[in-house]
Amino acid sequence: MDADRGGGQETKVIYHIDDETTPYLVKIPIPSAQVTLRDFKLVLNKQNNNYKYFFKSMDADFGVVKEEIADDSTILPCFNGRVVSWLVSADGTNQSDNCSELPTSECELGMGLTNRKLQQQQQQHQQQQQQQQQQHQQQQQQQQQQVQPVQLAQQQQQQVLHHQKMMGNPLLQPPPLTYQSASVLSSDLDSTSLFGTESELTLDRDMTDYSSVQRLQVRKKPQRRKKRAPSMSRTSSYSSITDSTMSLNIITVSINMEAVNFLGISIVGQSNRGGDGGIYVGSIMKGGAVALDGRIEPGDMILQVNDVNFENMTNDEAVRVLREVVQKPGPIKLVVAKCWDPNPKGYFTIPRTEPVRPIDPGAWVAHTQALTSHDSIIADIAEPIKERLDQNNLEEIVKAMTKPDSGLEIRDRMWLKITIPNAFIGADAVNWVLENVEDVQDRREARRIVSAMLRSNYIKHTVNKLTFSEQCYYVVNEERNPNLLGRGHLHPHQLPHGHGGHALSHADTESITSDIGPLPNPPIYMPYSATYNPSHGYQPIQYGIAERHISSGSSSSDVLTSKDISASQSDITSVIHQANQLTIAAHGSNKSSGSSNRGGGGGGGGGGNNTNDQDVSVFNYVL
């Protein structure tokens, strides 16, 4: 809006009203330096308080601003020789009409009429609201006099629900249906409509006459709450996790040969007509570089040395590469696959006595209802008391332990291509004694009892070890337990050809010691991808396969588990300690020598049926 001095005595003022685009022009017969707000209002003839007056001015801190002036004696600011003004309605509504094309007097007259009409409409609207409220109250009073007390209570409840739905108050939400209140009669459903009476419907029609703002406030719908995702049920068991699904850990170990002048490991491997079975760490010597590092353990498979991969190499080639690397000065980098952990923790194991079966929800619910409705029958059917054995009677313990329904897993085991009939693992025997022998409180006491059984010659180790280990295979000694013959467990003819007892004889042990070095069982999961498919008995299981059946010239099938691997490794360790190891070391240039024995390493074969398939050659080198 511009104001220019006209002839030194007249001031032209251009102003805007609310949101109108066309400005208005007035002339004030006063110099611009003396014109006040009162003079401006007199010219406009707007002495009421319906407008606020803003003028363009210059502020020292903010620059050009719109300054509101309310004092009539204030001189209007002059900005760049001009006076700029805006008139804004005080009540927030646009009270200006299309009078921009009319003269000033007609525009002022039209605006005055508009204000009067608005006031009259507001008064009429207020009177209508009061009349409607009075009518509604009278109707409610008449209905309250006619209805019974019970119906009145239902009506009040319906009104509360109605207002709750209209206003969206979360505190007034009805209680959720539970299993006790889920049954609803049809008569109750008919009486729970949104409008229970015609008066409420009339009230809703009356509410449509309100202003748009009031209708928005009344009919505001409550916001829907986001449905919380149901928590995952803990009943989803870990049955999908089996021993064979746990992968091996592949690590890279850099060994510094400057501090120690020898590697300090013995490597073992085997070969047969189906191919080579890989290179494994047989034992670790104290004081060597590997022992000082501490990350490599007996039974680990060597996959790579100094960026040379053993995947497509034979055992002889891999040994040659290892010997060449050891003889060279400098650090050695070994990539090894860790041996199978015989004792995985927590929920990664499933007890063999707990089979995994699909769950039928309907049968489960029916079974639960039957249990809750027949408590007396359940009380009568009590589980028979389990007979506990005397810990001092070792013979009775062995007899009970070898029964078919004893719970101890006794079956054919595979070790070094030899089938050991009716063998069990030491850890399983300790668990069985802990559960079935009286006055055995802890695992240490159970282990002591099983060790006494071994010393008393009731059970035997596969290679005649006299110290008990939970990771070894054991068989029952029939010479000490003649009553067990004919029970369907132990028979001499089930042993490999040439053996007269269930444990290997001393001569057989010496033969194995001279021919077989420390050879751990191949891991369940091959740590590297290859097309290697050996034809001998224990083939590697690929990741994700739940079970593997093994056939090695024997009439029975076997399933390889982590405990079997641990037992085989423990038995092999016992042979390692009996083997002669040779360590030749030199500072900066390590010389390695070893012994290689070919043929006849199978210890007599497995049953004598597939003799050609049982030809195994093993080696043992010390680095």
Swiss-Prot record:
Membrane-topology annotation of the record: Peripheral membrane protein
Tissue-wise expression: Found in egg chambers of the ovary and ubiquitously throughout embryogenesis and in disks. Expression is not seen in salivary glands, muscles or ventral ganglia but is observed in brain lobes.
Cell location: Cytoplasm; Nucleus; Membrane
Domain PDZ, chain residue ranges per copy: 252-324
UniProt PTM comment: Phosphorylated. Wg signaling generates the hyperphosphorylated active forms.
Gly residues: bias regions: 597-609
GO biological process terms held by the UniProt record: axon extension; border follicle cell migration; canonical Wnt signaling pathway; cell migration; compound eye morphogenesis; compound eye photoreceptor cell differentiation; dorsal closure; epidermis morphogenesis
Compositionally biased tracts (Basic residues): 217-229
Region Interaction with nkd: start-end pairs: 166-623
Keyword annotations from UniProtKB, A to Z: Cytoplasm, Developmental protein, Membrane, Nucleus, Phosphoprotein, Segmentation polarity protein, Wnt signaling pathway
Coarse class of the protein's main subcellular location: cytoplasm
Cellular component, GO annotation: apical cortex; cytoplasm; cytosol; nucleus; plasma membrane; Wnt signalosome
SMART domains in UniProt: DAX, DEP, PDZ
PANTHER family: SEGMENT POLARITY PROTEIN DISHEVELLED (PTHR10878:SF25)
Family of the protein in this entry: Belongs to the DSH family.
Record's subunit section: Interacts with nkd. This interaction may require zinc.
Physiological role: Required to establish coherent arrays of polarized cells and segments in embryos. Plays a role in wingless (wg) signaling, possibly through the reception of the wg signal by target cells and subsequent redistribution of arm protein in response to that signal in embryos. This signal seems to be required to establish planar cell polarity and identity.
Protein name listed in UniProt: Segment polarity protein dishevelled
Protein source organism: Drosophila melanogaster (Fruit fly)
Record gene name: dsh
